[in-house]
Protein backbone atom coordinates (compact mmCIF):
# COMPACT_ATOMS: atom_id res chain seq x y z
CA UNK A 1 0.00 0.00 0.00
CA UNK A 2 2.77 2.37 0.81
CA UNK A 3 4.61 1.53 -2.41
CA UNK A 4 1.43 2.07 -4.43
CA UNK A 5 0.81 5.43 -2.79
CA UNK A 6 4.39 6.45 -3.47
CA UNK A 7 4.07 5.60 -7.15
CA UNK A 8 0.84 7.54 -7.47
CA UNK A 9 2.38 10.55 -5.72
CA UNK A 10 5.33 10.48 -8.06
CA UNK A 11 3.04 10.39 -11.07
CA UNK A 12 1.11 13.38 -9.78
CA UNK A 13 4.36 15.25 -9.14
CA UNK A 14 5.63 14.60 -12.67
CA UNK A 15 2.30 15.70 -14.09
CA UNK A 16 2.48 18.93 -12.09
CA UNK A 17 5.99 19.64 -13.28
CA UNK A 18 5.02 18.93 -16.87
CA UNK A 19 2.08 21.30 -16.60
CA UNK A 20 4.29 24.04 -15.18
CA UNK A 21 6.77 23.64 -18.04
CA UNK A 22 3.95 23.87 -20.55
CA UNK A 23 2.73 27.06 -18.91
CA UNK A 24 6.22 28.63 -19.08
CA UNK A 25 6.90 27.67 -22.72
CA UNK A 26 8.08 30.53 -25.01
CA UNK A 27 5.46 31.44 -27.57
CA UNK A 28 7.04 32.41 -30.92
CA UNK A 29 5.30 35.49 -32.29
CA UNK A 30 4.23 35.67 -35.90
CA UNK A 31 6.70 37.60 -38.09
CA UNK A 32 5.95 41.25 -38.71
CA UNK A 33 4.55 41.91 -42.16
CA UNK A 34 7.21 43.18 -44.56
CA UNK A 35 6.71 46.79 -45.66
CA UNK A 36 7.66 46.88 -49.31
CA UNK A 37 8.57 50.13 -51.05
CA UNK A 38 5.45 51.63 -52.59
CA UNK A 39 5.47 52.94 -56.12
CA UNK A 40 4.64 56.65 -56.49
CA UNK A 41 3.11 57.56 -59.85
CA UNK A 42 2.13 61.14 -59.00
CA UNK A 43 5.20 62.73 -60.62
CA UNK A 44 5.91 60.23 -63.39
CA UNK A 45 7.72 56.92 -63.69
CA UNK A 46 10.61 55.84 -61.48
CA UNK A 47 9.39 57.40 -58.21
CA UNK A 48 8.80 55.53 -54.95
CA UNK A 49 7.64 56.59 -51.49
CA UNK A 50 10.38 57.02 -48.91
CA UNK A 51 9.29 54.54 -46.17
CA UNK A 52 7.40 56.24 -43.36
CA UNK A 53 6.78 59.44 -45.34
CA UNK A 54 4.57 60.82 -48.10
CA UNK A 55 7.62 62.07 -50.01
CA UNK A 56 8.31 60.55 -53.41
CA UNK A 57 11.91 59.95 -54.47
CA UNK A 58 13.49 59.13 -57.80
CA UNK A 59 17.15 58.22 -58.26
CA UNK A 60 18.82 58.35 -61.65
CA UNK A 61 21.90 59.31 -63.58
CA UNK A 62 23.97 58.49 -66.62
CA UNK A 63 27.46 57.58 -67.81
CA UNK A 64 28.89 59.50 -70.75
CA UNK A 65 32.01 59.26 -72.88
CA UNK A 66 32.86 61.96 -75.41
CA UNK A 67 35.71 62.20 -77.90
CA UNK A 68 36.24 65.09 -80.31
CA UNK A 69 38.89 66.44 -82.65
CA UNK A 70 39.54 68.81 -85.52
CA UNK A 71 40.38 72.49 -85.48
CA UNK A 72 37.61 73.42 -83.05
CA UNK A 73 38.01 70.73 -80.39
CA UNK A 74 41.51 69.27 -80.61
CA UNK A 75 44.06 69.91 -77.87
CA UNK A 76 47.79 70.56 -78.01
CA UNK A 77 50.20 68.33 -76.13
CA UNK A 78 53.84 69.22 -75.33
CA UNK A 79 56.28 66.29 -75.47
CA UNK A 80 59.39 66.48 -73.30
CA UNK A 81 62.14 65.01 -75.49
CA UNK A 82 65.05 66.49 -73.54
CA UNK A 83 65.76 63.11 -71.95
CA UNK A 84 66.44 61.77 -75.43
CA UNK A 85 68.74 64.65 -76.30
CA UNK A 86 66.15 66.45 -78.37
CA UNK A 87 63.96 69.51 -77.93
CA UNK A 88 60.40 69.83 -76.74
CA UNK A 89 57.81 69.42 -79.47
CA UNK A 90 54.06 69.93 -79.69
CA UNK A 91 51.45 67.74 -81.30
CA UNK A 92 47.70 67.96 -81.71
CA UNK A 93 45.45 65.17 -80.52
CA UNK A 94 41.79 64.55 -79.80
CA UNK A 95 40.01 65.64 -76.62
CA UNK A 96 38.05 63.17 -74.53
CA UNK A 97 36.31 62.82 -71.20
CA UNK A 98 34.29 60.31 -69.21
CA UNK A 99 31.50 61.42 -66.88
CA UNK A 100 29.33 59.86 -64.18
CA UNK A 101 26.26 61.89 -63.22
CA UNK A 102 24.14 61.08 -60.15
CA UNK A 103 20.68 62.69 -59.97
CA UNK A 104 17.83 62.79 -57.45
CA UNK A 105 14.29 64.15 -57.63
CA UNK A 106 11.79 64.46 -54.77
CA UNK A 107 8.18 65.61 -54.59
CA UNK A 108 5.71 66.21 -51.76
CA UNK A 109 2.21 67.67 -51.89
CA UNK A 110 1.59 70.54 -49.45
CA UNK A 111 -1.17 73.08 -48.82
CA UNK A 112 0.86 75.62 -50.81
CA UNK A 113 1.48 73.35 -53.78
CA UNK A 114 4.08 70.79 -54.77
CA UNK A 115 7.35 70.92 -52.83
CA UNK A 116 10.10 69.47 -55.02
CA UNK A 117 13.88 69.23 -55.12
CA UNK A 118 16.46 68.31 -57.72
CA UNK A 119 20.18 67.56 -57.37
CA UNK A 120 22.88 66.56 -59.82
CA UNK A 121 26.50 65.77 -58.99
CA UNK A 122 29.04 65.05 -61.73
CA UNK A 123 32.32 63.17 -61.53
CA UNK A 124 34.47 63.71 -64.61
CA UNK A 125 37.84 62.55 -65.90
CA UNK A 126 39.06 64.68 -68.80
CA UNK A 127 42.15 64.12 -70.95
CA UNK A 128 44.01 62.20 -68.24
CA UNK A 129 44.06 65.25 -65.98
CA UNK A 130 42.46 63.65 -62.95
CA UNK A 131 38.92 63.49 -61.61
CA UNK A 132 36.90 66.66 -61.00
CA UNK A 133 33.65 66.84 -59.05
CA UNK A 134 30.98 69.49 -59.50
CA UNK A 135 27.60 70.18 -57.93
CA UNK A 136 25.59 71.27 -60.95
CA UNK A 137 22.13 71.48 -59.37
CA UNK A 138 20.76 71.57 -55.82
CA UNK A 139 17.51 73.51 -55.70
CA UNK A 140 14.21 73.53 -53.80
CA UNK A 141 10.95 74.58 -55.43
CA UNK A 142 7.52 75.33 -53.99
CA UNK A 143 4.94 76.21 -56.59
CA UNK A 144 6.62 78.81 -58.80
CA UNK A 145 9.31 79.77 -56.26
CA UNK A 146 12.78 78.24 -56.60
CA UNK A 147 15.91 78.71 -54.47
CA UNK A 148 19.34 77.11 -54.53
CA UNK A 149 22.08 76.16 -56.96
CA UNK A 150 20.86 76.27 -60.54
CA UNK A 151 21.75 77.55 -63.97
CA UNK A 152 20.98 81.19 -64.71
CA UNK A 153 17.43 81.97 -65.82
CA UNK A 154 18.99 84.07 -68.58
CA UNK A 155 20.20 80.80 -70.13
CA UNK A 156 17.45 78.35 -69.20
CA UNK A 157 14.29 80.41 -69.75
CA UNK A 158 14.96 80.88 -73.47
CA UNK A 159 15.78 77.18 -73.89
CA UNK A 160 19.58 77.28 -73.85
CA UNK A 161 20.80 77.21 -77.48
CA UNK A 162 18.42 74.52 -78.68
CA UNK A 163 18.91 70.81 -79.05
CA UNK A 164 21.94 71.04 -81.31
CA UNK A 165 25.42 69.53 -81.25
CA UNK A 166 28.23 71.84 -80.06
CA UNK A 167 25.88 74.59 -78.89
CA UNK A 168 28.78 76.41 -77.23
CA UNK A 169 30.52 77.55 -80.43
CA UNK A 170 29.05 81.00 -79.71
CA UNK A 171 28.70 81.77 -75.96
CA UNK A 172 25.07 82.60 -75.24
CA UNK A 173 24.84 83.02 -71.46
CA UNK A 174 26.08 82.05 -68.00
CA UNK A 175 25.37 78.83 -66.15
CA UNK A 176 26.36 78.25 -62.49
CA UNK A 177 24.76 80.51 -59.89
CA UNK A 178 22.78 80.56 -56.67
CA UNK A 179 19.40 82.16 -57.23
CA UNK A 180 15.97 83.06 -55.90
CA UNK A 181 13.42 83.00 -58.71
CA UNK A 182 9.70 83.00 -59.37
CA UNK A 183 8.05 81.69 -62.53
CA UNK A 184 4.45 82.55 -63.42
CA UNK A 185 2.75 80.07 -65.75
CA UNK A 186 -0.54 81.02 -67.38
CA UNK A 187 -3.05 78.68 -68.92
CA UNK A 188 -2.71 80.06 -72.44
CA UNK A 189 0.96 79.37 -73.15
CA UNK A 190 2.23 82.56 -71.51
CA UNK A 191 4.88 82.45 -68.80
CA UNK A 192 7.15 84.97 -67.11
CA UNK A 193 10.12 84.82 -64.75
CA UNK A 194 12.11 87.04 -62.42
CA UNK A 195 15.34 85.82 -60.87
CA UNK A 196 17.78 87.30 -58.35
CA UNK A 197 21.20 85.74 -58.89
CA UNK A 198 24.60 85.83 -57.18
CA UNK A 199 26.72 85.09 -60.24
CA UNK A 200 29.82 82.94 -60.41
CA UNK A 201 33.49 83.46 -59.61
CA UNK A 202 34.43 81.47 -62.72
CA UNK A 203 32.24 82.06 -65.77
CA UNK A 204 34.11 81.82 -69.06
CA UNK A 205 37.29 82.55 -67.12
CA UNK A 206 35.99 85.72 -65.42
CA UNK A 207 34.83 86.54 -61.88
CA UNK A 208 31.22 87.76 -61.87
CA UNK A 209 30.32 86.94 -58.26
CA UNK A 210 28.41 89.79 -56.60
CA UNK A 211 30.46 92.07 -54.36
CA UNK A 212 27.70 93.61 -52.19
CA UNK A 213 24.03 93.08 -51.29
CA UNK A 214 22.77 94.03 -54.75
CA UNK A 215 22.09 90.88 -56.82
CA UNK A 216 22.14 90.38 -60.56
CA UNK A 217 18.59 90.54 -61.92
CA UNK A 218 16.97 88.54 -64.73
CA UNK A 219 13.46 89.02 -66.12
CA UNK A 220 11.79 87.36 -69.06
CA UNK A 221 8.52 86.53 -70.81
CA UNK A 222 7.60 83.70 -73.15
CA UNK A 223 4.65 82.65 -75.31
CA UNK A 224 4.47 79.03 -76.47
CA UNK A 225 1.97 77.33 -78.79
CA UNK A 226 1.85 74.24 -80.97
CA UNK A 227 3.48 76.08 -83.87
CA UNK A 228 6.47 77.17 -81.75
CA UNK A 229 7.10 80.11 -79.48
CA UNK A 230 8.62 83.52 -78.83
CA UNK A 231 10.75 84.38 -75.82
CA UNK A 232 12.47 87.53 -74.58
CA UNK A 233 14.80 87.73 -71.60
CA UNK A 234 16.90 90.58 -70.19
CA UNK A 235 19.46 90.77 -67.39
CA UNK A 236 21.33 93.35 -65.34
CA UNK A 237 24.89 92.71 -64.11
CA UNK A 238 25.06 94.57 -60.78
CA UNK A 239 28.86 94.31 -60.53
CA UNK A 240 29.66 95.90 -63.89
CA UNK A 241 26.38 97.87 -64.00
CA UNK A 242 25.64 96.75 -67.55
CA UNK A 243 22.79 94.83 -69.13
CA UNK A 244 22.15 92.32 -71.89
CA UNK A 245 19.10 90.86 -73.63
CA UNK A 246 18.16 87.96 -75.88
CA UNK A 247 15.22 87.20 -78.15
CA UNK A 248 14.35 83.83 -79.64
CA UNK A 249 11.84 82.53 -82.18
CA UNK A 250 11.01 78.80 -82.42
CA UNK A 251 9.07 77.21 -85.29
CA UNK A 252 7.85 73.61 -85.28
CA UNK A 253 7.56 72.47 -88.90
CA UNK A 254 6.47 68.95 -87.92
CA UNK A 255 6.49 66.79 -84.80
CA UNK A 256 10.15 65.92 -85.48
CA UNK A 257 11.49 68.94 -87.40
CA UNK A 258 11.92 72.36 -85.81
CA UNK A 259 14.06 75.46 -86.24
CA UNK A 260 14.94 78.49 -84.16
CA UNK A 261 16.75 81.80 -84.42
CA UNK A 262 18.19 83.65 -81.43
CA UNK A 263 19.94 87.01 -81.14
CA UNK A 264 21.64 88.73 -78.22
CA UNK A 265 22.61 92.33 -77.50
CA UNK A 266 24.62 94.04 -74.76
CA UNK A 267 25.02 97.73 -73.97
CA UNK A 268 28.83 97.52 -73.81
CA UNK A 269 31.56 95.95 -75.93
CA UNK A 270 33.12 94.54 -72.76
CA UNK A 271 32.13 91.21 -71.24
CA UNK A 272 29.72 90.86 -68.33
CA UNK A 273 28.03 87.93 -66.59
CA UNK A 274 25.18 87.89 -69.11
CA UNK A 275 27.15 88.87 -72.22
CA UNK A 276 29.98 86.36 -72.71
CA UNK A 277 30.31 87.21 -76.39
CA UNK A 278 32.58 89.93 -77.81
CA UNK A 279 31.05 93.08 -79.27
CA UNK A 280 27.49 94.25 -78.79
CA UNK A 281 25.62 91.73 -80.97
CA UNK A 282 25.60 87.96 -81.08
Model-flagged regions — what are they?
Residues 14, 19, 70-71, 76, ...:
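Residue-level detector of alpha-helical segments with a strong bias toward transmembrane helices
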Residues 1-64:
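N-terminal periplasmic/intermembrane-space "pro-region" immediately following the signal or transit peptide
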Residues 75-85, 201-212, 264-281:
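Solvent-exposed loop segments that connect transmembrane elements
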Amino acid sequence: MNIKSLLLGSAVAFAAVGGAQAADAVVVADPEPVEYVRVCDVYGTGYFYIPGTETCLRIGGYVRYQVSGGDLWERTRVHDDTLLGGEDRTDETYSQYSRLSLQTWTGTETELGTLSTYTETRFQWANGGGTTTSLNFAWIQLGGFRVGKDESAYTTFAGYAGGVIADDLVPYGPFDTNLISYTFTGGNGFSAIISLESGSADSYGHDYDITDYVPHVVAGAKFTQGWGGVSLVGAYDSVHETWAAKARLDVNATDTISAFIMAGYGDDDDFNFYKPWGGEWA
